[in-house]
Curated annotation (Swiss-Prot):
Family note: Belongs to the G-protein coupled receptor 1 family.
Cellular component GO terms, alphabetical: membrane; plasma membrane
Membrane topology label: Multi-pass membrane protein
Residues bearing carbohydrate: N5, N265
Transmembrane segments: 26-46, 55-75, 100-120, 140-160, 198-217, 238-258, 272-292
Signal keyword on record: no
Protein name listed in UniProt: Olfactory receptor 10K1
Extracellular side: 1-25, 76-99, 161-197, 259-271
Protein's UniProt keywords contain Cell membrane: yes
GO BP field: detection of chemical stimulus involved in sensory perception of smell
Gene: OR10K1
Length: 313
């Protein structure tokens, strides 16, 4: 009889930034501007790569895919968050929460494997420069992209299914601004040891394995660079990897802090702050890190702007 009388959770109350009630409108304006800027910068990068044939190379192919990923990644979270900031009723349905978690994990996990593919691309460019165009043909690039998406789909499907098969009979107050794994698991009626298992699975398949692949690529890259006799040549060669290394460092630092650390040492407000950094800020800065440091891309952008606005000049 006790089980029958329990109320099944059909929606979650998204508390998010409720502790900052007086700043809701200010946060809305800030996050809206950041979101629009993210969409704009990534759209510019994608269109420049598509329109300029000089950028039709494996490295820029992956950069365009990365920008597409960032747009989708933020679209899953930010619009709903903006609506909640201005709404009195800050809720999300049970199904909507599951869809949001699946989508977020899919794009986030695919992003990790995409970074591994980009590391492999840098390895092939530096260690096999003469055969690079053959070894990294269109078919190989498409295959790496498909593999990244397949891995992301598997991780997100398994993890989301396991989480939402748990019984939810207790509180429905979600202490976060979107349906991330840990905040949702805290609301499950039974999850003894299960939360650690799910997070471990996510960490291994979506973080540890891609990171190991990246490390293997860079061990070989560094080994090849050290064989270059000129210090100028070594610096110039390694500089082609600098942007990728910065993005990898930021991505894995934030993700590891959220998913691979002991949960008892940090509050939900600290989790929210870190989550803002990797769901809103990194999608804005990642493509910019790649493009602004790249002279070839900046030249292509100037050509594209010139051909678009001054076609007859």
């Amino acid at each position: 009889m006790e089980q029958v009388n329990k109320t099944v959770v059909r929606e979650f109350v998204v508390l998010g930034f409720s502790s900052l009630a007086r700043l809701q409108q200010l946060l809305f304006v800030i996050f809206l501007l950041l979101y629009l800027f993210t969409l704009g910068t990534n759209a510019i990068i994608i269109s420049t790569i598509v329109l300029d044939r000089a950028l039709h190379t494996p490295m820029y192919f992956f950069l365009a895919i990365l920008s597409c990923s960032e747009i989708c990644y933020t679209f899953v979270i930010v619009p709903k968050m903006l609506v909640d900031l201005l709404s009195q009723k800050k809720t999300i349905s049970f199904l909507g929460c599951a869809i949001q978690m699946f989508s977020f994990l899919f794009f986030g996990s695919s992003h990790s494997f995409l970074l591994a593919a980009m590391g492999y691309d840098r390895y092939m460019a530096i260690c096999n420069p003469l055969r690079y165009s053959v070894l990294m043909g269109h078919g190989v690039c498409m295959g790496l992209m498909a593999a990244a998406c397949a891995c992301g789909f598997t991780v997100s499907l398994v993890t989301t299914s396991l989480v939402f098969h748990l019984p939810f009979h207790s509180s429905n107050q979600l202490h976060h601004f979107f349906c991330d794994i840990s905040p949702v698991l805290k609301l499950a009626s039974q999850h003894s040891g299960f939360s650690q298992l799910v997070i471990f699975m996510l960490g291994v398949f979506a973080l540890v394995i891609p990171l190991l692949l990246i490390l293997v690529s860079y061990i070989r890259i560094i080994s090849a660079i050290l064989k270059i006799p000129s210090s100028v040549g070594r610096y110039k060669t390694f500089s082609t990897c600098a942007s990728h290394l910065i993005v990898v460092t930021v991505h894995y630092s934030c993700a590891s802090f959220i998913y691979l650390r002991p949960k008892t040492n940090y509050t939900s407000s600290q989790d929210t702050l870190i989550s803002v950094s990797y769901t809103i800020l990194t999608p804005l800065f990642n493509p910019m890190i790649y493009s602004l440091r790249n002279k070839e891309f900046k030249s292509a952008l100037r050509r594209t702007i010139g051909q678009t606005f001054y076609p007859l000049s």
